[in-house]
Structures are given as C-alpha cells and as structure tokens.
C-alpha cells in the first residue's frame, strides 16, 4: 500500500504545496527530457473532458476539427519574420536525420499560424468560400528556460483555432466572440472566474495586430493567463498570399484570427480550487465524479452485493470509481481527497443495514446520509452545488483582491501584498512596463473591458490625464 505523503500547507510555501499536490494527486510523472510530462489518468482524464465539452461548443458553432503536421520547414516559417522572431528563443530545430544533415532546418511547431496559411491558401478562392474556421487539438514544443508542471513545459497539449474572413469587422467580431466563449466555458465547466481584456502592445502575441486574454487569479494572488484570442488582421495572409476574389472579382487578402487554450488549465484548476488536503477537481471535468468507498467489502458478501447495487445505479449518469481494496476506509477517504474527487460515497456496516449511504463533499467535507432510492437525485444536486460553491469562492476571492491605485508607491505596496492592481496608464511604451516589472515583478496583464471609467485620471507614471486603465499583477 503506497503511503500518502504530507502536503506542505499552501499558506506556508505555495510553490512547494503546488508540487506536493501535483505529485500526490497522481497527476503526472516527469518525462526523460527537462520540461516534459507524463500525464497520468487523473490529469489526462481532465483534459479529455475539457476536449469533450469544448468539442460540443465547436460543433454547435459549425467549427470542424483538423490536424496539421508537427514539422514546419524553415522556408515556410521565415515568410513571417515578426512571428519567428518572437518565438526564436523557444524554437526546437531538427538539423539532422541519423548522420545526414538536412538540406533545410525543420522546426517543431511552437504554434500553427504558418501551417494554416498553406492550408487556407489551398481552401480559399472566392468570397463565397469564406469564412473558413477550423480547430485542431495538438501538442506544441516550446523550449522554456524555466519549467513548472502544466504552467510552463517544453511540450504541452492545446486547442488552437484559426479562421479566415472576408472583412476586418467580421474577423474582429469573431475574435471577441471566441474570448467570450472561453470565459463562459471556464465559468461553466471549470468554475473559474476571469477578467477579460486586451493585451498591451508589449504583451501581445508576436505577429498579431491585437491580442485578447482571460486572466484568472490563483490562491497566491498571481495571475494566470487562461485563454487568448488574436486578431491577426492581414499580417499572415499578406506574407503568405492567402487571398480571394471579392464580389467585384478583385483580389483581396483575408482577415484572420487565432485562439487557444491549453493544459495550463489543469494548473489553473489546481491553484484556484485546491486546499491543504489536495486538489479539488470541478465536477463537470472530473475524470471520476464519485468515489464509492466501502468498509472491507470483500469480507462480506452482503456488503459486496450492496456496493455492486450502488455502482449499478450510479455508473450510467455519473463517472464512478469503486475502491474494493482491503485498505482502511480512512485511507481510502484521504486518497480520494488528495486526488480531488468531487464527491465520495462511504459505505459502512450501518449504512448497509439501513439501505443508505453517506455522501461526503470534497469542497466542504460535509456529510449527508442518503437513501439508496434518492442517491441519483441527491448526487446530481450535490455535484452542481459543489461546482457553484467552487465558483463563488473563487469569485469572492478575486473581487476582494482587486484594488484601484493611482499612486505609484501604493501601487508597489499592493503588488507586494499579492493584489491585482488596476491603475490609469497612458504610457503605452514597452519601456514603461519594463520599468514597472523591474521594480515590482508585476506585468501588464490586460486592459480590462469592464473597468474603463468615464472622464480622465492621472497616469500612474507620468501623471498626464488618461482614460485607460491597465490591470497589473505578478503572474505565472
């Protein structure tokens, strides 16, 4: 029987707590190359459920899945210099096959914008072919200097969508639509509240005209970018000659977007909802929604029969696991808590005798005795209540830790206090943001959509009057 290791309290050392819960929650093993991960069933199951639910959303929008190659020739990449320049430090490059040097370097995809240009060019001839919108589920390679499971890794999994449109208005509208879709998805399935906004020029995606983001607050007060959408304008289509004939038979370049979310969301789940007992997985993406734990079922044919009956009732409407091992009920409960199963059912001798079970919520640890006849109804209601509570707790924490500051000395203090700070800023230069980051460790997360006030305020740095507010925070 594997011993359950002690988890460092998150208040004591958040980074160590994160490492402990990732390890003890049976989420990963480390791969043989720095920054690579082996996704265990408990983490890959989360990703599978994210895929399942998001694919339903894509299908409802009429968006189809495709898969493009992992390998990109250097000649194709170089056509969009600004794009390759932004990724240059992270590009993994193949130069040899066996002992033979390649005639051209091959890149392992850091993202797929350039590959989609070749695809779109073959797909689009007329305005009647537009819009073209595709999604792919893929792995990408970015040679990160500093790695952290799920948050920054050499290889990670993601969803990336790409679209081509007839007009700038249509493409811009779709960029915002997908950001709202991500926001709703995180709220509905991951129980994570976010702040929507536009990235500053310094923080936008290389090659994009503008980038939009969802910023989530982790329990240590740091921000985590949890989904982005990019309005690419004609930056890529002009470089790769992706054009169409308009209604007047004139050549035009398409307007494009790209948008993605990744396995970084697993890290967001851990750091938004986890506690000192382990991880807490939101019910609608949990690989196992209900753990059925019995007191030594193999020692009693009657209890084993009762456990089988409970499993049969629950396994159709829910994702269920039954622990039939001879481990103690206390050990099983602790293991279930560490692994973040939203709801567990404990079955002891008295429960069996009364034809009932004990339901235990992972989020509050509240216990409830339920008749086997009501178990489906109560389990469904309880799982929804768990999701709602996780979201409300995260929403309250976000609201209570956002402050508006106009004075730079106060700004530095609040950043040191692990707050999200919203401040007026007219200084749009990268140098101003670099200076703030150097002094405080905070970066400009976004220009929030919902926090732009009428009238003008003094800029945090130069004191000129501005209408623009920017969200700053330390971030992963």
UniProtKB/Swiss-Prot annotation:
Subcellular location: Cytoplasm
Cystine connections: none
Top-level enzyme category: ligase
Catalytic activity entry: tRNA(Pro) + L-proline + ATP = L-prolyl-tRNA(Pro) + AMP + diphosphate
Organism phylogeny: Bacteria, Bacillati, Mycoplasmatota, Mycoplasmoidales, Metamycoplasmataceae
Protein name: Proline--tRNA ligase
Physiological role: Catalyzes the attachment of proline to tRNA(Pro) in a two-step reaction: proline is first activated by ATP to form Pro-AMP and then transferred to the acceptor end of tRNA(Pro).
UniProt-listed GO biological process terms: prolyl-tRNA aminoacylation
Keyword Cytoplasm attached: yes
CDD domains in alphabetical order: ProRS_core_arch_euk (cd00778)
């Amino acid at each position: 029987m594997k011993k359950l290791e002690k988890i460092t309290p998150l208040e004591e050392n958040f980074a160590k707590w994160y490492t402990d819960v990732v390890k003890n929650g049976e989420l990963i093993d480390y791969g043989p190359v720095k920054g690579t991960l082996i996704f265990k069933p408990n983490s890959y199951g989360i990703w599978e459920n994210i895929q399942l639910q998001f694919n339903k959303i894509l299908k409802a929008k009429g968006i189809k899945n495709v898969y493009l190659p992992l390998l990109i020739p250097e000649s194709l990449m170089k056509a969009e210099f600004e794009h390759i320049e932004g990724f240059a430090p992270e590009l993994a490059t193949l130069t040899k096959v066996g002992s033979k040097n390649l005639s051209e370097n091959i890149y392992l995809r850091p993202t797929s914008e350039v590959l989609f240009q070749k695809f779109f060019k073959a797909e689009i001839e007329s305005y009647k072919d537009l819009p073209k919108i595709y999604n792919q589920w893929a792995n990408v390679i970015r040679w990160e200097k500093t790695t952290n499971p799920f948050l920054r890794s050499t290889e990670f999994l993601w969803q990336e969508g790409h679209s081509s449109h007839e007009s700038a208005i249509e493409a811009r509208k779709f960029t915002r639509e997908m950001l709202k879709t991500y926001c709703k998805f995180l709220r509905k399935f991951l129980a994570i509240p976010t702040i929507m906004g536009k990235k500053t020029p310094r923080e936008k995606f290389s090659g994009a005209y503008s980038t939009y983001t969802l910023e989530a607050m982790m329990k240590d007060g740091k921000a985590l970018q949890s989904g982005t959408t990019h309005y690419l304008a004609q930056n890529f289509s002009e470089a790769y000659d992706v054009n169409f004939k308009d209604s007047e038979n004139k050549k035009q370049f398409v307007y494009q977007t790209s948008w993605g979310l990744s396995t970084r969301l697993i890290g967001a789940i851990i750091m938004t909802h986890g506690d000192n007992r382990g991880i807490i997985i939101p019910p609608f993406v949990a690989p196992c929604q209900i753990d059925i734990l019995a007191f030594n079922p193999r020692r009693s044919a009657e209890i084993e029969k009762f456990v089988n009956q409970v499993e049969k009732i629950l396994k159709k409407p829910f994702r269920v696991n039954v622990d039939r091992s001879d481990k103690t009920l206390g050990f099983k409960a602790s293991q279930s808590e560490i692994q973040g199963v939203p709801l567990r059912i404990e079955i002891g001798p008295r429960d069996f005798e009364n034809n009932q079970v004990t339901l235990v919520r992972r989020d509050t640890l509240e216990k409830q005795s339920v008749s086997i006849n009501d178990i489906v109804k109560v389990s469904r209601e309880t799982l929804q209540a768990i999701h709602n509570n996780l979201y409300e707790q995260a929403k309250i924490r976000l609201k209570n830790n956002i402050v508006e500051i106009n004075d730079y000395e106060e700004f530095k203090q609040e950043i040191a206090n692990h707050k999200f700070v919203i401040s007026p800023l007219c200084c749009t230069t990268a140098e101003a943001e670099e200076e703030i980051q150097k002094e405080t460790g905070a970066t400009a997360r976004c220009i929030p959509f919902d926090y732009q006030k009428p009238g003008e305020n003094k800029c945090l740095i130069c004191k000129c009057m501005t209408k623009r507010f920017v969200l700053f925070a330390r971030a992963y």
